[in-house]
């Protein structure tokens, strides 16, 4: 993220760091995120209420592309491009080909699906509430949707619009690199940071997920084997 300014001063013998609000995200103003929010919510609703499953998958592809755009605007370029490659290039296209191969009855396409609209709206609101608690407060606090959520919910517990957020140096901060002071000054790329986290702190979870994927492949092969 660009245009993040830091100001340090000495108070009570401790070095404090002031984080000033960030209005620019990856070279773009954060107001552009409102456009992606509205389009993503629209695609998400139409994905659920669409009667034709093929059209529903197309809306799902559009939803994934918009989410990738949000990640790219947030400065997470690697995850945004990975979203397009994995979800759009593999998963969604696989769903689309499967739906084209199976026999879908016309009566199923013409069936009433308006009952799913409340579920679609509830799912979108729940997803946004969870994402709002995960993302940093200074990332989207100037957007329209975030201002509405701040009015009705207290999901952002740090107010940096009037007062700068103060982070004490004595607080525990998790670094991707080792504990050596010289390594903390080295700038990591996103790929290096993700690789260091996956293969050091969360290596056991990486192994567990690999075993789960292996069991899924073996299970699919066992099910499809013809019994003699």
Curated annotation (Swiss-Prot):
Keywords, alphabetical: Mitochondrion
Primary subcellular site in the record, as a coarse category: mitochondrion
Localization annotation: Mitochondrion
Domain of life: Eukaryota
Any one GO molecular-function label of the UniProt entry: NADH dehydrogenase (ubiquinone) activity
Protein name: Uncharacterized 25.4 kDa protein in COX3 5'region
Pfam families in the cross-refs: Oxidored_q3
Any GO CC annotation of this UniProt entry: mitochondrion
